[in-house]
Every structure is written in C-alpha cells, then in structure tokens.
Amino acid sequence: MFPMVTEFMNYGQQTVRATRYIGQGFMITLSHANRLPVTIQYPYEKLITSERFRGRIHFEFDKCIACEVCVRVCPIDLPVVDWKLETDIRKKRLLNYSIDFGICIFCGNCVEYCPTNCLSMTEEYELSTYDRHELNYNQIALGRLPMSIIDDYTIRTILNLPEIKT
C-alpha cells in the first residue's frame, strides 16, 4: 500500500513541475506578443548598420606606400600587392592592389594595421554575384565609394518607416 501512495505522490509532483515549466514557457511567449515585429522586407527596407560594421573594404590608391603590412597581418594572406622598386628615388611604386571578397573573412586586420590609413571598412554588405570571379576587386573597384543606406532615397530604412497607430 505504501509504495502505491509514494508513486502517486511522485506522479503528482511531476505533474505540478511539468505544468510549471509549460506555464513559464507560455509566459515568455506571451511577453513577446505585444512587441513590434523585427522582420523587414529586405530589398525595399534595410537596417542601418552600426558605425563599426565591417563591410566591403575601401582602398585609396594614392595613399598606399606598398609596405605590404596588410598582407602580413591578414590571417589568410589575401591582399595581392604588386609593386615595382623605383631605383632613382629608392621607393616602391604600387602597380596593382586587389582583394578577393569570395575568400575574405572581413576580420579588419588590414584596416587596423595600415600605417597610411588607405584602407577602410564601408557599410556595403551586398556582395552577392552569380560568378565568384566577380568578387575579385582590383584597385579601381575597391576605390569606388558605396552609396550610403541612409542617403539612398529609394530604400526605406527602419528610421523613416511610417508610424504604426495602435
């Protein structure tokens, strides 16, 4: 008789515990019910990136001294720097600079350690293409400034969405 009573008490305790856990989960679900949705309609609405967002790298050809610090600090030795030594002035002259964004991990080491600040991170993150060879950017493609999301009048950002009346 006593084992049957203890089994019944254990069953009751387990039922109460399970009901409490289900109730806690339901309360969390209900707490999210009155919040605004986070989902955006991507091609037409975009989130504004933070100041420290690590997007596509912008390169300024005139500032580069071809020191190759960016290549040495890159964990995958990605930037390709072609230069020629000018013997009359004893300086390097930059011929070509390219980065393959299909391989780049956007760590930002090249930007951080560049002594002349010729590299900077932009807020551009739309780098998708149908051919991965198009992701190999040379100094001309790297030098183009991206259109700012805030300044683009065709795109609605979260800041300029119409107010939702409740």
From Swiss-Prot:
NDH shuttles electrons from NAD(P)H:plastoquinone, via FMN and iron-sulfur (Fe-S) centers, to quinones in the photosynthetic chain and possibly in a chloroplast respiratory chain. The immediate electron acceptor for the enzyme in this species is believed to be plastoquinone. Couples the redox reaction to proton translocation, and thus conserves the redox energy in a proton gradient. It is a peripheral membrane protein. Belongs to the complex I 23 kDa subunit family. It is an enzyme of class 7 (translocase). PROSITE patterns: 4FE4S_FER_1, 4FE4S_FER_2. One of its GO terms (molecular function) is iron ion binding. The lineage of its organism: Eukaryota, Viridiplantae, Streptophyta, Embryophyta, Tracheophyta. It catalyses: a plastoquinone + NADH + (n+1) H(+)(in) = a plastoquinol + NAD(+) + n H(+)(out); a plastoquinone + NADPH + (n+1) H(+)(in) = a plastoquinol + NADP(+) + n H(+)(out). NDH is composed of at least 16 different subunits, 5 of which are encoded in the nucleus. Its EC number is 7.1.1.-. This is NAD(P)H-quinone oxidoreductase subunit I, chloroplastic. Its cofactor is [4Fe-4S] cluster. Pfam families: Fer4 (PF00037). GO terms for biological process: photosynthesis, light reaction. [4Fe-4S] cluster 1 binds at residues 64, 67, 70, 114. It is found in: Plastid, Chloroplast thylakoid membrane. It comes from Aphanactis jamesoniana. Disulfide bonds: none annotated.
